[in-house]
Amino acid sequence: VNNLKHYVLYGLIALLWLFIILFVVFSEPAFGYSNNKEFIQSVNKCADYLDKRYKKEERIPRKLLLTQAALESNYGRSRYAKEGNNLMGIYQFKNLHTGMTPAGNQNAKFRVAKFQSKCQSIEYYMNLLNTKDFYRSFRNERELQSKMRVNDVNRYFYLLYNYSTNPEYPQLLKKTYKEITNMGF
């Protein structure tokens, strides 16, 4: 009976350590920043964490992801980033009561989605690009670039023209990409 108690106790201790290790290794990274460079570093850490869930061919090209996060959230300074953890400018068209009303557009037929964490908004974005028909040309280009072993992020900018209603979106992405590149990313 004493040996059984010891085995149970050791088993519980082992399970506790396993839980702690899994929590530390697989928990979402902290998302803190006070300037543009720290914002990009935080997005990068989140992307590293999320990439573990995707096959290599399903991963979003990192520089594209960083560029869109910076542009869509103004480096994490937008109202949607601060109040709704939405770094990617993601709208919702159902359950409008759960999203944020766009400023100056109270009658909008959409809301800006809210997320429990900033990393969760990035994961949602990754799933959008990997599953929605709107982004099939993006996925085809990603596959082609992978086969050719090139990474031309500028080609993606034009394929994501329908990510935004702004006709200048590809040019804005290019400008933001240059900013990020100048920061050393």
Where does each model-flagged region fall?
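Catalytic cores of secreted/periplasmic lytic hydrolases that degrade extracellular macromolecules
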Residues: 2-67, 71-185
